Curated annotation (Swiss-Prot):
It comes from Acinetobacter baylyi (strain ATCC 33305 / BD413 / ADP1). One of its GO terms (biological process) is translation. Belongs to the bacterial ribosomal protein bS16 family. This is Small ribosomal subunit protein bS16. Pfam families: Ribosomal_S16 (PF00886). One of its GO terms (molecular function) is structural constituent of ribosome. Keywords: Ribonucleoprotein, Ribosomal protein. The keyword Zinc does not apply. SUPFAM superfamilies: Ribosomal protein S16.
Amino acid sequence: MVVIRLARGGAKKRPFYQIVVTDSRNARDGRFIERIGFFNPTAQGQAEKLRLDADRFAHWVSQGAQPSERVASLAAQAKKAATAA
C-alpha cells in the first residue's frame, strides 16, 4: 500500500521531517517515491515550519495513497494557512 508519512532527519534532539510518499513496507527513513514537503517542529522566529505541495498531496490521495494521522493533520494545517494568506 502507498502511504504518505514523515521521514525523520536532522540531528539528535533536533528533528526535521520530510513528508514523503512511499510503500508501507519500506523503512521509515528508507526508500521513497516522492518528497512532497517538509515539517520543522523546532522552527523559531521567521523560519518556515511547514511546506507541503498541495497539488501533489491531492494527486497521491486521489491515486489511493493513505496519509498518516500526523500528515493528515499537517495537510489540514497547511490548507488553513494557505487560505488565510
